[in-house]
Structures are given as C-alpha cells and as structure tokens.
Amino acid sequence: MPVLKLAAVFANRRDTQEETGEEHLTFNAIADPTDHLPFASLVLSASPKLIALNEQLCVGLYLVSERAMLNRPLDELSHGDLPASVGIFPVIAKPGLDASSADTHWREVHGPLALKVHSAMTHYYQLQIVHRSFGPAWHGLVLL
C-alpha cells in the first residue's frame, strides 16, 4: 500500500533531527564536494515541520507516494535494517510524457525489469511525486 510522505532535497548535507527536534529519514551524499550532484541530501518525513526547512537551501519540496518494490516499506525498517549504502536518483520528466503515463511505465515496465536485471539489490523504492511545491520538474525519486 503506498504511503504519502514529504520529500525535501537540499543542496547541502542536513542534520534534520537537530534542526527540527524530530527524527526524519535523512540520506546524505558521501561525495565531496557535492556541487556536481542534483542534490546532496534527501529527507523523508510525514511531519509538517519539514516544510519549515524549505527556506534553508532547499532545492525542492515534494509530496511523494512510496512504493516498496523490494523489501519492506521504509517506515517498517529498523535502523539496522536500512541499507548501508543507498543510491538516490531523480526520475527526470520526459517531454511529452505526462506524470501518470510515466508512473505507469515506471511501475509496470521499468520496476520489474530492474528487479530482474539487478539481482544483487537488497532495497528498491520508487517515490512517485504526486505534488511538487517547488523544485525541479521530476516525476519521482528512486532509492536503490
């Protein structure tokens, strides 16, 4: 069952627990420098406090629907069950392809193909963007 969450992407690495007093699922880039990346930090949360961070170098703020393609939903994983290393990639909007068609292709064609080809994956999550408050016009984010 899809779960709606806020997803914020930042130009710099974040410590959102310290910034908001709440625990969020935060993925920070390990590359140094990070200016060649589309973003350096992805923060997922159900808390509206995440919206307040949008003034602090936020690249984009999105409402996303999480689909767990491989493994349990992120909220169900203990800290020890989270992957030690995560690849995060934006799904760039293809000109002429609306969001609904792109999501159908991602869910029904690309997702199953990725699971078949990348047999060593332990986690695969599709974060479909259902609303963009601001930021790049992506169709989604993928966590591998």
Predicted feature locations:
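Macromolecular interaction modules
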Residues: 1-144
